[in-house]
Amino acid sequence: MKFNFSLIVSIVLISFSTLMSCQTRTEQEQKPNIILFYVDDMGWQDCSLPFHSETTRLNKIYHTPNMEALAKEGMKFTQAYAYAVCSPSRISLMTGMNGARHQVTNWTLRMNISPDPERKDITPPQWNMNGMTMGEDVPLTIQAITMPQLLRESGYRTIHAGKAHFGAVGTPGENPLNLGFDVNIGGHAAGGPGSYHGEYNYSAAWRNADRIWDVPGLEKYHGTDTYLTEALT
């Protein structure tokens, strides 16, 4: 889903729990920590870290040292495919399925309502407009075991921060806690925030817009000058 404001980033933090008493310290240390960024509208050349065999002209425009450091200390994948809008790409990352398999082929928001504009000359195909669930029998969803759930079963603590956009309002998939995450910070059904500003309570109410965009769970920062990025952090 495209917006005329800055990049929307959600971060998945997956750390191996040190509370697994049945495992030795050596076994625990073999489990790597995982940080996965879901970034909207970011091209493969929109950073200083090259994802090609050589640095491109556009790579030289940007300065993203943290991405370079993460790639140097971790693992970089250079062959991938992303969909034109966010929900399909996010669900593919969560499930390992491509769009033809999970059939979430557009961004999701309202239950049983497609965001596609109505046209008299075209009948849109049936698709999973309610997003994804993990076991619940919800119409027009893809039911699948998620990556965070599998990691949690392997002893990881899973944290989601920022934009979620995995399932429509009123379905279990709107809440990352129902998709294998232990902690959810600000993630909900909408594909963007009502506002980035704490003085507006991260809500669209100040411009008389739909409250469906309000960011949940950040009430302690309401009425302050805390920018959304800082509140999530």
Can you annotate each of these PLM segments?
Residues 45-51, 82, 89-92, 102-107, ...:
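Short, solvent-exposed loop/turn and secondary-structure capping segments
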Residues 55-90, 96-101, 157-159, 179-188:
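Short, structured active-site-proximal loop/turn typified by the sulfatase FGly-forming signature C/S-X-P-X-R
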Residues 27-75, 164:
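Active-site-proximal N-terminal segment of extracellular/periplasmic enzymes that hydrolyze or transfer
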Residues 1-9:
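Bacterial N-terminal signal peptides that target proteins for export
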Residues 109-157, 164-233:
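Formylglycine-dependent
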